[in-house]
Amino acid sequence: MSLTMEWNDARLRKEAALIPPRAALGASMIYHGLGKLREGAPEQVGGYFESVGLKPGKSLAVATGIAEVFAGVGAIIGLWTRPAALAVLATQAFALGKVTAKNGYDITKGGFEYNIALMCIAGALLIAGPGLFSAHEGIERLAEGRGPRKFLRKAQPSPLLRLIKLIK
């Protein structure tokens, strides 16, 4: 597909429609991940994790923070979007099950409304993938030899290309 297609093209609009959910999910996950990694937070979050039965709390807090930051960056730039979506689904399902489910749906009462919204966005990205306007698409184009010819010679299908397509 040429990037010079007209905006009237329905497929182009559908591809562009993946950008806002990727950006929203990514920004949210980066924010929450960095919150778990800032000074003193691993101990605080780790203490909470241990209070709900997750041990070792501090290590899990750091691992969760790192996973959320990487998932957020991946979602925003459209690289490893499906693994990022899986990470979001896992962390949010866990948060829902261990923390928010007992409070009901209403977010103002500590409920799971926000978890469900993030999980729905992640589920959609898991199904759709990163879309045309993504780092993954750019890398794939380069690996297939569809990118700037002066930088790459035409690539033959390779194990690397198959891996790139697999982790889309």
What spans do the regions from the language model cover?
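Conformational-control "hinges and anchors"
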Residues: 72
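Membrane-interface interhelical connector segments
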Residues: 40-56
